[in-house]
Design a protein with these regions (language model features):
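Radical SAM/AdoMet-radical enzyme domain recognition
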Residues: 19-42, 46-156
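A short acidic, helix-capping loop that chelates divalent metal ions and anchors anionic groups
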Residues: 13-16, 100-105, 164-168
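Canonical Radical SAM [4Fe-4S] cluster-binding loop centered on the CxxxCxxC motif
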Residues: 1-22, 234-237
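Auxiliary Fe-S-binding modules of radical SAM enzymes
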Residues: 143, 149-150, 157-266
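Glycine-rich phosphate-binding "P-loop"
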Residues: 14, 41, 242
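N-terminal pre-triad scaffold of radical SAM enzymes
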Residues: 1-7, 26, 30-43, 217, ...
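Short intrinsically disordered, low-complexity coil segments enriched in acidic
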Residues: 1-8, 105-116, 251
């Protein structure tokens, strides 16, 4: 990644050191399609620092998934948005933790340029990911809702994941009270299948709450992750049960493992 945000969970990888080959990506994608996986999300790290990212998307596109999305910090999105759309990318999530200059390594200008490019390229609906941090950006939630409204974007308010005990203790912000306020204001509350997440439709903007350390999150998790070296990761929070990819049976094993993980956690 071209940033080093102190709260980043790195998709659960402690020491990512490799970059998966295009050949391995296609092998995994082909087998994922064969067992009924419908959606692919590309994340990182920062996917756009990979020089062949458009080739990665082009490979995925060949297999006709319902949705191909990408999570980015937005720094390079202005440069690559149209190329990514041409390769087959449907939409993007942009990290947008603050609109204050340099509060979290990014400037408002970086975010706005990436957002503008994504809109012009048709990478929509755009989601803005805001990790809410006590004492850093928790006073900006209303401002961010307005920003999402102005830009026809969905705002995801995300609770901090504990990757550093000291940082977590100082900056964890519980979103329960915010969620109560949204429930009062919402025209419609939508419950999504994935993670049992709730979306609050305020009429002219949609707000989604993401709370990673909850029973609902684990019980309704429908994701498998692929690590940077091509192994299958059934759970974001664990690294002791990675599965080496060999064929579609590896993916099926990982899916079965998710059920075991949930029982153990509860």
């Amino acid at each position: 990644c071209n940033l080093s945000c102190p709260y980043c969970h790195r998709e659960g990888e402690l020491n990512p050191a490799k970059e998966i080959s295009l050949e391995k990506i296609e092998e995994i994608i082909k087998n994922a399609k064969s067992i009924g996986i419908k959606k692919i999300k590309i994340t990182g790290g920062e996917p756009l620092v990979r020089e062949d990212i458009a080739d990665v998307i082009d490979i995925i596109k060949k297999y006709n998934f319902e949705d191909i999305s990408l999570v980015t910090n937005g720094f390079l999105l202005d440069k690559y948005a149209f190329e990514l759309k041409g390769a087959g990318l449907n939409r993007v999530n942009i990290g947008c933790d603050s609109l204050s200059s340099n509060i979290l390594l990014k400037t408002a200008e970086n975010i706005k340029n990436g957002l503008r490019a994504a809109k012009e390229a048709g990478l929509t609906p755009i989601k803005l990911n805001m990790v809410v941090l006590k004492g850093i950006n928790d006073k900006e939630i209303k401002k961010m809702i307005e920003f999402a409204r102005e830009n026809d974007a969905v705002l995801q308010l995300i609770e901090l994941i504990n990757t550093d005990d000291e940082f977590y203790k100082e900056h964890y912000f519980n979103l329960k009270e915010i969620e109560k306020e949204l429930e009062k204001k919402a025209i419609i509350v939508i419950k999504k299948d994935m993670h049992n997440r709730r979306q609050y439709d305020l009429g002219d903007v949609m707000i989604e709450i993401v709370r990673p350390f909850t029973k609902d999150f684990c019980e309704n998790c429908t994701r498998l992750r692929v690590t940077s070296d091509g192994r299958i990761k059934p759970c974001l929070m664990r690294n002791d049960n990675l599965i080496d990819f060999k064929d579609k049976c590896s993916l099926i094993e990982a899916i079965n493992e998710k059920g075991v993980l949930y029982v153990q956690a509860n």
